[in-house]
Amino acid sequence: DSFIKNLLLDNLLLVDIYNRAKKLHIDADVRRAVMILELQQEKDHSSMESVKSFFGGKSKDFITAVDEKSIIIVKELEEGEGYADLDKLSHAILDTLGLNQNEETHIAYGTIVNELKEVSRSYKEARMALDVGKIFFGEKDVIAYSSLGIGRLIYQLPIPLCKMFIKEIFENKSPDDFDEETLVTIDKFFENSLNVSETSRQLYIHRNTLVYRLDKLQKSTGLDLRVFEDAITFKIALMVVRYMKYMETLEY
């Protein structure tokens, strides 16, 4: 177990990884991915045991922990198994353990790696996926590093740069100043790929009402969401604001 922990945390020299793996009869060149199950409350002995029994004590998968709130699974993949299987497995773990959506429980997984020395990278990716997932995909309980999209980019931006970007876009206004109605309208409009008719239908409002709201928004921000480029700028700005807010909560 200490070998796996040190491997995950990148505490081992390359030569040590292979020497110790050999001694412990751990195959070095097998496809693996790291999954992190994060529980809302501190994990108790039973949740760790449940995960272990879910995997049926298969000696090829390693289950461990490096902190109070998460359980780490280093999963070995069979030939032909891929991300779809990791996704299925993640949902199965949540279902089996009764960790359904009402608890703030998430599973994230990193990319599939081919060598033992790469396992720490998959672990770092799964960690990042958990964070990025909390900021941008709060409603998802399974998060894949490979599907973080633009959220992963934003997550790596320094806060001063974010503040500068928001100031340039909104000048003295902040997206937080928009009322609930405006924010719902914007979300729906993006959801429907900037389609005015479809958005107004889903919001149960007249097309002209939606056009009026978009015009009003354009007046206050200088951005016309019907124009693709402006819509992208606005979408990224909203995501940047969410990221900044999340980072603020961590500081307190």
Task: Locate the predicted segments by residue.
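Signal-transmission linkers at sensory-effector interfaces
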Residues: 1-2
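Cytosolic nucleotide-utilizing catalytic cores of signal-transduction proteins
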Residues: 6, 10-252
